[in-house]
Regions:
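HIT superfamily nucleotide-processing domains
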Residues: 1-235
Length: 235
């Protein structure tokens, strides 16, 4: 097994702050290095205060209002999804769309890859985060995986696929209705490319699999490891 190290270091930023009556304020910053590809991430411990200052408390009434106002024109709602969304041709997806439970997958009208599909996760137009059930997420992932297999059958060079999800506008979603996106083709995106190349370099150097070694390290550390479901390890 290779020597996986979680490198991090802390720094402080000092300034005179109007939020503290122009007294000195000190912010703690933590820099973390990715053990595989070496990229650096910065954690600002005071960013939660920035969010609260700029956006205030969550306005649940406003969220409900936006959800209700957007529902009549939502193409992902069950009364619209089969009549207003695009379909795949039979050479890519024999059934034109993929349906698993309440999840329905269809082509993205504005694709960013050779294969780019959207998966409406549920018939319900708006969900609170606590209402995302295991079944809802599992159905969506299964629909996306079925599409991945169909895409590969249509083009065996389409080996680089990702499944992505962001919810509501602060996370970058353009519509309210819960959904996932699955996309890719024969060209990997930068982050995926770096991960694949880093994994190969690690194997050539250590003669072991980085991801198996990472799980072993995480289990021993007992800081982030959650558990295992089938062949899937959760961190």
């Amino acid at each position: 097994m290779g020597n996986i190290q979680f490198v991090s270091f802390k720094r402080h930023s000092k300034f005179i702050s109007p939020l503290k009556n122009f007294q000195e304020d000190v912010h703690l910053l933590e820099h973390r290095r990715d053990p595989l590809i070496g990229t650096m991430s910065i954690l600002g411990y005071n960013l939660a205060d920035k969010v609260k200052m700029l956006f205030g408390d969550i306005d649940h009434d406003l969220i409900e209002q936006v959800a209700q106002e957007s529902k009549p024109r939502c193409f992902m709602c069950p009364e619209n999804v089969n009549t207003t969304t695009p379909k795949y041709s039979s050479d890519i997806l024999p059934q034109e769309r993929v349906t698993v439970g309440e999840a329905t997958l269809f082509p993205n009208l504005f694709p960013l890859s050779e294969f780019h599909a959207v998966c409406a996760l549920t018939h319900t137009h708006y969900l609170n985060l606590r209402d995302f059930s295991t079944e809802i997420l599992a159905n969506g992932i299964q629909a996306c995986l079925k599409f991945v297999k169909s895409a590969f059958n249509a083009n065996s060079s389409a080996k680089y696929m990702t499944i992505n999800c962001n919810y509501l506008f602060p996370a970058g979603a353009s519509i309210v209705h819960p959904h996932m996106q699955v996309l890719g083709g024969d060209v990997p995106y930068t982050y995926l490319k770096n991960m694949l190349e880093g994994s190969l370099q690690y194997f050539e150097k250590n003669q072991s699999n980085f991801w198996n070694d990472l799980i072993s390290v995480e289990k021993k550390a007992r800081e982030r490891y959650i558990g295992k479901t089938g062949e899937i390890e959760w961190i």
